[in-house]
């Protein structure tokens, strides 16, 4: 890195769109998510996607997308971010390039490459995932005239807009659902519950504080539904080992779990495979995974959706309007529809009316602050 701070002339488009609405208003309830929308990327860490046809003379703004480990076509977290920038392109004419680092060390390198680029010159660089925070802290301080946004972490800098989600709140809903259904006789699609076991599971990707929020919320939701339900927990160590996730899920199903919730990114496909093989159920994450992974819709009871797409869309369109909330933290939870539960497309009929009502009630209680969901495992009986 250079010793001196670097600034460069911003090329903000004139005649931009009007200021974007608040995220809560933009959300308007959970949407039906489509496919991954991912492009066919090269293997190089800094490979730029050309699908957006970068032409700064035509685009309202130019955005560089730096995705989390695992890259596009994960049918989960990264693909949700990709849908957001695609929508910004359709609605506001935003141009963008895609970048898929394959290591944590690659994040800062790509961030700096984009920030120093003159062709194209980026109006906004979107950093998807908490592992980008360390690199971005350094990059943002060096390129002080460059605007950034980050998802899932807070970087304290005047040129960074930080979007964070209260995943523990959405995971509480997932746990409440699992805790209620594991005690019932559910037999639909390719799975079934075993009410005599009353055991559920959680599989995380990296054993990190952010993923602990998923586990903590899930455990709290299960306990809220039924304190006698056992929760099995294991961490994969990454977000892309499909076979590893399948093996862990298989052990959990063999140990009596009939529903497994995951926060393991693209590796979650392995959990769905194990659910089909063992005739059990799963709960997806980040996107409606019964839609993004339709071949597993017969075992995906629901998904805990994070509106990463809306965060990216909001940041991109705010950049067009020259009102990016740089230097601020935008926190999204159940109260703003930033997170929530969507039932699976095939298995929605399996959800009893009283269970739906229970989840609707708990959602209102969490949103109102009547139920305070823990963010740490130590507060829920976890490790």
Language-model-detected regions and their locations in the chain:
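Terminal disorder- and signal-encoded targeting elements
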Residues: 1-146, 150-162, 169, 173, ...
């Amino acid at each position: 890195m250079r010793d001196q701070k670097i600034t460069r002339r911003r090329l903000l488009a004139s005649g931009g769109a009007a200021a974007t609405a608040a995220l809560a208003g933009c959300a308007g309830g959970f949407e039906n998510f489509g496919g991954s929308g991912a492009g066919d990327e090269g293997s190089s860490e800094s490979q730029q996607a050309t699908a957006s046809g970068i032409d700064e003379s035509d685009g309202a703004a130019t955005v560089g997308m730096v995705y989390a480990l695992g890259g596009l076509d994960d049918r989960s977290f990264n693909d949700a971010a990709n849908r957001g920038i695609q929508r910004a392109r359709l609605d506001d004419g935003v141009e963008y390039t895609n970048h898929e680092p394959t290591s944590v060390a690659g994040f800062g390198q790509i961030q700096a490459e984009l920030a120093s680029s003159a062709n194209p010159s980026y109006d906004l660089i979107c950093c998807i995932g908490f592992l980008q925070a360390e690199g971005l802290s350094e990059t943002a301080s060096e390129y002080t005239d460059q605007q950034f946004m980050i998802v899932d972490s807070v970087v304290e800098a005047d040129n960074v807009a930080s979007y964070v989600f209260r995943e523990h709140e959405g995971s509480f809903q997932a746990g409440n659902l699992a805790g209620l259904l594991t005690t019932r006789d559910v037999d639909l699609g390719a799975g079934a519950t075993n009410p005599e076991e009353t055991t559920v599971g959680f599989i995380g990707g990296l054993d990190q504080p952010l993923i602990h929020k998923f586990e903590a919320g899930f455990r709290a939701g299960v306990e809220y539904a039924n304190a006698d339900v056992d929760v099995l927990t294991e961490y994969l160590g990454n977000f892309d080992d499909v076979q590893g996730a399948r093996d862990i899920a298989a052990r959990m199903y063999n140990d009596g779990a009939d529903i497994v919730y995951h926060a393991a990114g693209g590796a979650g496909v392995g959990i769905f495979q194990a659910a089909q093989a063992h005739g059990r159920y799963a709960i997806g994450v980040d996107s409606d995974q019964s839609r993004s992974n339709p071949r597993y819709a017969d075992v995906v009871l629901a998904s805990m959706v994070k509106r990463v797409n809306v965060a990216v869309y909001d940041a991109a369109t705010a950049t067009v309007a020259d009102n990016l909330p740089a230097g601020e933290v935008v926190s999204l939870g159940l109260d703003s529809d930033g997170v929530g539960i969507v039932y699976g497309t095939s298995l929605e009929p399996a959800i009893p009316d009283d269970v739906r009502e229970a989840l609707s009630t708990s959602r209102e209680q969490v949103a109102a602050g009547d139920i305070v969901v823990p963010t740490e495992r130590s507060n829920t009986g976890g490790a």
